[in-house]
């Protein structure tokens, strides 16, 4: 099966790229990447013209993209080159495209502490909207200080959890508006503290924290731990084509979302762009599609 453009990833960046490329008259196929982080966001207030859950917005994007592209519900396992063609191999088929757009996003960054992996699914979670309802009326800790952590804490409070935010610094990185919502709900914050280990028997029962100011450990009883300490880019597939990445693993792109490999473009959270938001991911996708169109037009 041959296409003009293959888009790997179906979050905001990938779906926008598919819409724009399809409207340019290109034959486009979109492959599922990691589940989009947007689908787990409980509420969105900074995407112009839309207020609602991330899942609702993503479903609208998928519906629109389906008018301009094919959608393969297959996992991409490898990418390569065959002459002028890029080859995309899934767990069940093989596809060829003249250009490729990586919109693979990222996955949750781990703390790397004892008990984290052992209690995953038994009190440890990386998705408040997925697992929060299991902890109604129970005590939970949210680890982190950015937008995701604060949003998770607010959401968990709203559904009836006893929430405490734990942050390693003395001030949050989250947007001011989110911070105001957090404090308005009287959600307590444990400042200047990091997780040492997560303990329990069959499930999470307590978390050992380290106070960086006092330089001492202390214990907090908890039934759940929601970890929101950032993302790790999913760029291993792009690297197989020789695409350059920075020291953190993000794909290097120019203002046109072009990589160092002709015909290979990238968009969204997998790129080294400074701001990672839904609206910027969509912009990246549009630019990447335009660049792919210009690349194919020259060829």
Residue ranges and their predicted role:
Residues 107, 112, 118-134, 229-280, ...:
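FAD-site-proximal beta/loop scaffold in flavoenzymes
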């Amino acid at each position: 099966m041959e296409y003009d453009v293959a888009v790997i990833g179906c979050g905001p960046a990938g779906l926008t790229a598919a819409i724009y490329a399809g409207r340019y008259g290109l034959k486009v196929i979109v492959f599922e990447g990691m589940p989009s982080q947007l689908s787990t966001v409980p509420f969105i207030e900074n995407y112009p013209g839309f207020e609602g859950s991330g899942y609702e917005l993503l479903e609208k994007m998928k519906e629109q993209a389906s008018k301009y592209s094919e959608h393969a519900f297959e996992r991409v396992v490898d990418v390569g080159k065959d002459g002028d063609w890029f080859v995309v191999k899934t767990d069940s088929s093989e596809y060829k495209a003249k250009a490729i757009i990586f919109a693979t996003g990222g996955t949750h960054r781990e703390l790397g502490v004892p008990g984290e992996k052992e209690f995953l699914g038994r009190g440890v979670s990386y998705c408040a909207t997925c697992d929060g309802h299991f902890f109604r009326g129970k005590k939970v800790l949210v680890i982190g200080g950015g937008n995701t952590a604060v949003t998770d804490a607010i959401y968990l409070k709203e559904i009836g959890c006893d929430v405490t935010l734990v942050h390693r610094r003395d001030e949050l990185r989250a947007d001011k508006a989110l911070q105001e919502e957090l404090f308005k709900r009287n959600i307590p914050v444990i400042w200047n503290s990091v997780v040492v280990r997560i303990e329990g028997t069959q499930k999470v029962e307590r978390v050992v924290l380290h106070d960086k100011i006092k330089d001492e450990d202390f214990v907090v009883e908890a039934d759940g731990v929601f970890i929101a300490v950032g993302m790790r880019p999913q760029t291993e597939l792009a690297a197989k084509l020789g695409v350059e990445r920075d020291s953190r693993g993000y794909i290097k792109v120019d203002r046109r979302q072009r990589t160092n490999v002709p015909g290979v473009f990238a968009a969204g959270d997998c790129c080294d762009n400074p701001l990672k938001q839904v609206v910027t991911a969509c912009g990246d996708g549009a630019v990447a599609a335009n660049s792919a169109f210009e690349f194919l037009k020259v060829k």
